[in-house]
């Protein structure tokens, strides 16, 4: 594929984000590939995985053995099923980096930046949000630390603290989960954010 222009925008001065994707294969290795939009934050290298927007593609042709995965196939040895799969995968990646969808998410981030956190009891905000979104007590401690370090006491700051903490988690699968949880926090209904803040009052 030829080079394409990077899709990027600013959430705030000095805070640039750009469109990306997470591509993962199935655990059993049967030719299933998932493509999920990712918003990459240049400031700290965090990625927010857009939950609910994952697309799956399944390779309908022959599945290679583990040894064959280390071989680069030329166009001559690709089967018709291979070519179809690769074409569909390319289209899925393009769709995942759709500029309109990216702009909508940036607008969501900009809005969250202005949704202040109740600072009367910041640990209570983190604990309540963690309980709502399936973040463990140990992870909550890490999120709290990252939140305080960022000095961004807003809904946007909380979501970024979760994705920043994902970089400290040993399990890749759990880190990926936390990137998705970051988006779920970012996009929570306003009344849920209000309730979380009220509990911490």
Regions found by a protein language model. Give the residues of each.
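Short, small-residue-biased leader/transition segments that mark boundaries at the very start
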Residues: 2-6
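Intrinsically disordered, low-complexity regions enriched in serine/threonine
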Residues: 11-201
């Amino acid at each position: 594929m030829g080079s394409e222009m990077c899709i990027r925008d600013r959430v705030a001065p000095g805070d640039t984000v750009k469109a990306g994707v997470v591509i993962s294969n199935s655990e059993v290795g049967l030719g299933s590939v998932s493509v999920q939009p990712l918003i990459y934050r240049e400031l700290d290298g965090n990625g927010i995985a857009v939950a609910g927007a994952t697309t799956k593609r399944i390779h309908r042709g022959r599945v290679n053995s583990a040894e064959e995965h280390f071989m680069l196939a030329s166009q001559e040895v690709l089967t018709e099923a291979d070519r179809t799969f690769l074409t569909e995968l390319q289209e899925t990646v393009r769709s995942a980096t759709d500029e309109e969808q990216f702009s909508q998410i940036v607008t969501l981030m900009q809005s969250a930046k202005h949704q202040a956190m109740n600072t009367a009891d910041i640990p209570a905000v983190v604990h309540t949000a963690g309980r709502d979104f399936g973040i463990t007590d140990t992870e909550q401690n890490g999120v709290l630390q990252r939140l305080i370090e960022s000095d961004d006491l807003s809904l946007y700051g909380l979501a970024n603290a979760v994705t920043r903490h994902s970089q400290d988690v040993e399990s890749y699968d759990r880190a990926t989960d936390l990137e998705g949880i970051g988006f779920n926090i970012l996009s929570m209904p306003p009344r849920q954010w209000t309730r979380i803040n009220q509990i911490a009052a």
